[in-house]
Amino acid sequence: MPFVTASGALPPGYTPIQRVFDTAVWTPGTDRGLPYAAGSVLDFDTGPGVANYQYLLARDALFASDFEAERKRPAANLALQFAPNDTSVYTFEAFYQGYEEEMFNNLHFTFADWWGTLGPNPASTITLYPGTNLIKTRVVGAPFGFNSGDSTKQDTDTFVYALNGKWQLSDAFSLEADLSVQKSEFNTNFIAVRTERVPGSITLDFNSGGGIPSWHFNDDAEMMNAALWNMGQLFQNKGRDEGDAKTITVDGDYAFADGSAFEKLSFGVRYDDRGAIHFQPAPTGSPFLPTPRTLAQMPEGMLWNNKDFFDGANYIPGQWLVPNGYWIQDHADEVRGLYNMPAGGPDVL
């Protein structure tokens, strides 16, 4: 993201290291990005004139995801075979395969772009990569951040039924037929609760080694203080997919007598009917609590903290509090009630 410089001439209306949001000044999403050579300029005159000013480049945010999940794959199979005589065999099979997964994404996110609390000497809060306009390290005062307890629970049930018959109708003629029916359904439910805070400051290095960033707040221990986390928004999503298939195949072989021009005639027919339906989630709001609260004022089961994140690496925070995704999923309607949202979650269309 582009920022104006820390000192020297600044575009009108800007303060040191202010982020440039105006897309009339720069175009996001280009394949080459913006030039990163030292002294590169942007034209801040959005009219016919030219007003070139130097700029800096930096990331606007950092995040860490501490993810865990449990997956199950239940399955069952039944096969029955019946041969009433030497010339016919009937086989029935029923098969079930399931998939169940519950995922908890413990997300820590912090902005690193705020320009309003840089102190009397903003230039002292950053360092650049030599010969570039890329910010390598910086200290940002009062950065907004949030943690989010994201829970996704999803499952698939698939049932297959098949009936097969084989007949030796004569010495020359054999026939085989197969009928199979399949039905599958996939359901997914997502619910998340966010908490927010504004700490005193963050000190960061966008590449502390091997392309991995490093950051610490003025007091990382505050991340474990539930009273310092304000309750944020509730997010919900839901989806369903259904599929079915009906397949009939018939195969036959007829052997001609010796001396015939042809030895064998093989023939077959197949009918396949498949269907699929995708149900979109209905648009759902992302409300705040009707009355502001901190995480400390929420039900005890909602609090969760991790430990030794990233194998205890000392260049990033090692633990933080977050809404417990497992508890939120298990008490989804209770959580929805706190946010004045209807029970059952969003509908699917």
Give the positions of each predicted feature.
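Flexible glycine-rich, low-complexity coil/linker segments exposed to the extracellular/periplasmic environment
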Residues: V4, G8-R59, P122-P143, L204-Q233, ...
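Amphipathic, soluble alpha/beta structural segments
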Residues: V4-V25, L175-E176, S180-R197
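Outer-membrane beta-barrel transmembrane strands
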Residues: R59-N105, V140-A192, M224-P283, D311-L349
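Short secondary-structure boundary/capping segments
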Residues: Y14-T15, L107-F111, I191-E196, P281-F288
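Transmembrane beta-barrel wall of Gram-negative outer-membrane proteins
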Residues: M1-T117, P122-P130, Q154-N164
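Short, intrinsically disordered/low-complexity patches at protein termini
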Residues: D113-G116, V198-S201, G210-G211, F288
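Outer-membrane beta-barrel domain signature, especially the mid-to-C-terminal portions
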Residues: A192, I202-D205
